[in-house]
Amino acid sequence: MASLKIPANIPLPEEDSEQLHKAFKGWGTNEGMIISILAHRNATQRSFIRAVYAANYNKDLLKELDGELSGDFERVVMLWTLDPTERDAYLANESTKLFTKNIWVLVEIACTRPSLEFFKTKQAYHVRYKTSLEEDVAYHTSGNIRKLLVPLVSTFRYDGNADEVNVKLARSEAKTLHKKITEKAYTDEDLIRILTTRSKAQINATLNHFKDKFGSSINKFLKEDSNDDYVQLLKTAIKCLTYPEKYFEKVLRRAINRMGTDEWALTRVVTTRAEVDLERIKEEYLRRNSVPLDRAIANDTSGDYKDMLLALLGHDHA
């Protein structure tokens, strides 16, 4: 469930564009106006605002925001204003760069987005960067990491649903996974094939059979080798495919509780999940930490950056 709060009576894109244009004029930028508009519009509405702004003022709204804002506030507003597939393309490209290398983000995008949305992200990536995501991932990774990541970003995974699950296949592949993991054959082709090609519904059925038959979840079996980067990547993919809200809760917990806030992780999760399932993530965060997420963020951030995050969380005032 989305956390985004949209007012009952939405102004026309022309009105929103005019107010944003006014927010950029004068001696200082009206950050509050920017938050009050953009943080309360969905992706379609933000896209209309960008189009109307360009038509009326012959300027790119994103470039205007880039010129007027700075720091973490600029990043959260810019990421939020992008179309979701544009945003994911940008984050995926950023995650392959040597100076910001974060391959976990690639797994996150590949495994938590619906298949059609991820396909459109790859199209947006090609348009923006004149190369394919698959090519960039292959170029910027090596060894076992590449062996897992390239299939993850290459496959068009059928989303599937519970009534389409092949129970016999789930039982068989649960045994295959158990055999490979107990043998520590983590890079085995069958293991990678199962995790990168099966529908999410089929994988969930397989992993449920795994737990029922062998007494623990697959990630518990992988825990003893969790210091290995490849195994961590494997665990991340499994968590993203099966319990995305638990995965994102952990990212947020680490971003907030570490020595010094990880603003990039915090910004990424809030902007990418506010229109998807941030309410469920908030519930999981409260269950896990006994503190509401909005309060934790309010205590760990400040200024316009804090206000924008809280607005996207559905709590303009914490």
From Swiss-Prot:
Signal peptide: none annotated. GO terms for molecular function: calcium ion binding; calcium-dependent phospholipid binding. The modification Phosphoserine is found at S95, S290. Ca(2+) 2 binds at I256, R258, G260, D300. Ca(2+) 1 binds at F24, G26, G28, E68. The modification Phosphotyrosine is found at Y129, Y285. The keyword Phosphoprotein applies. Induction: Up-regulated by heat shock, dehydration and salt stresses. Ca(2+) 3 binds at T301. Expressed in flowers. It comes from the Eukaryota. One of its GO terms (biological process) is response to heat. Keywords: Acetylation, Annexin, Calcium, Calcium/phospholipid-binding, Metal-binding, Phosphoprotein, Repeat. The modification Phosphothreonine is found at T100, T112. Annexin repeats lie at residues 11-82, 83-154, 168-239, 243-314. It holds the Pfam family Annexin. The modification N-acetylalanine is found at A2. Belongs to the annexin (TC 1.A.31.1) family. A pair of annexin repeats may form one binding site for calcium and phospholipid. This is Annexin D6. It comes from Arabidopsis thaliana (Mouse-ear cress).
